[in-house]
Amino acid sequence: MNPLNLSTFIVFTLFAASATTALTCFQCTTSEGSDYCVSSFPKPSQCLPLMNYCTKIITTSNGAISVLRSCNVVSLDNTCMETGTGKICSFSCDTDACNAGSQFHCNRFQLPFLLTLF
């Protein structure tokens, strides 16, 4: 292999490897501590392969707040839905550490799935 082809191969390989690095998301739940995952949370960590979305799900029920920040295979709609005792909101994004913010939502089709998480 001549030097030009070798250089091209190395550059292409490095570019391809950097383009396929895994997404990083904040990953925590309020079950790990009362304020944990609400206003303070760990550094973002690498998601498993095929998990291309960061999600944040906030559930309020009778004044109590539960938060789940995680990696996900599918994108959740950015919506909120009222429940009998509060609401469930979800937010999805696809860039590193994007699930830290306060924007969130969910819809009625996701409610049965989301309720199984808590």
From Swiss-Prot:
UniProt note on tissues of expression: Expressed by the venom gland.
Bridged cysteine pairs (disulfide): none
Gene Ontology CC terms: extracellular region
Leader peptide range in chain numbering: 1-22
Primary location class: secreted
One term of GO molecular function: toxin activity
Additional facts recorded: The scoloptoxin-05 family has remarkable similarities with the three-finger toxin family commonly found in snakes.
Record protein name field: U-scoloptoxin(05)-Cw1a
